[in-house]
Regions:
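C-terminal active-site subregion of NodB/CE4 polysaccharide deacetylases
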Residues: 1-61, 67-68, 138-240
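Histidine-centered catalytic micro-motifs
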Residues: 2-4, 125-133
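Acidic (Asp/Glu)-rich catalytic clusters
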Residues: 31, 75-82, 109-128, 182
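A short, conserved beta-to-alpha structural element at the edge of catalytic cores
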Residues: 81-103
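Short beta-strand and adjacent tight-turn residues that come in two discontinuous sequence segments
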Residues: 87, 129, 189-191
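Surface-exposed cleft-lining segments at the edges of enzyme active sites
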Residues: 96-107, 133-141
Length: 240
């Protein structure tokens, strides 16, 4: 399961941005190699043991839901017949990313609800990245419940469908957060840079950052890549 963040022309000091040209080349190489991108329900079925992923199957996800995806990522995926899941911060739909540290003073806009509705049914699914992007492990149980529940309700109201999954901000989640996500009505939870998935509420993903090769690593991260991803995550201050 691959995890992207920004696909933008504008540069910044952070590491989560991939240029549109580089993203297009990565997807083109995956398509040429015969990879097939799974839907969210198929990923959940694999993680829960209901199906086995074929050797040429992967999943593509995006965290944060930046507006640049509608111009630079979604059309590329559609052209190659690839599906993807975009995890959105619901309180910031259509707004600037003021929840995040502005490295170099640059702000990036998030997808608006109308953007998401325009891509529904075209291979792009939308799921929760909480309401405001806090590090869930550092807030109260009541706070975690509010973040998860408010986000799920906002998506149902704006998109007309419920969301099956949540991506934990910063990949930070333990047994408490996984339990609360399940209690809030989520069927799956996604982490980051964890190697093997522990359960359907803790699905591991391979982060694709600035330094990623043109052919992204698929499967369990190699030790150096996992260390780099963990360091990047630890250094991500965001709202905490």
């Amino acid at each position: 399961v691959l995890c992207y963040h920004k696909v933008e022309r504008r540069q910044e000091l952070g590491v989560t941005r991939i240029s549109p040209k580089r993203f297009a080349k990565q997807i083109e190489r995956l398509a040429r190699a015969g990879w097939r991108a799974l839907s969210l329900s198929e990923v959940i079925a694999c993680a829960s043991g209901q199906r086995t992923a074929a050797p040429n199957e992967l999943a593509i996800t995006f965290d944060d839901g930046y507006r640049g995806l509608r111009e630079h990522a979604f059309p590329v995926l559609e052209a190659h017949g690839f599906r993807a899941t975009c995890f959105v911060i619901t309180d910031f739909a259509g707004k600037l990313n003021r929840w995040d540290v502005a490295y170099g003073g640059r702000r990036f806009a998030h997808l608006a609800w109308r953007d998401m509705r325009a891509w529904q049914g075209r291979g792009i699914e939308f799921a929760s990245h909480t309401a405001t992007h806090p590090r869930l492990t550092r807030i109260s149980e009541l706070g975690v419940h509010e973040e998860l529940d408010r986000s799920r309700r906002a998506m149902t109201e704006a998109l007309g469908v419920g969301t099956m999954a949540v991506s934990y901000p910063f990949g930070a989640a333990g047994p408490r957060e996984e339990r609360l996500a399940r209690e809030a009505g989520y069927a799956a939870g996604f982490g980051i840079a964890r190697g093997w998935s522990r359960s359907v509420m803790s699905i591991a993903r391979t982060p694709v950052y600035l330094w990623a090769p043109l052919t992204p690593a698929v499967g369990v991260l190699r030790a150096p890549e996992q260390l780099a991803a963990l360091v990047a995550n630890r250094c991500a201050i965001g709202t905490t």
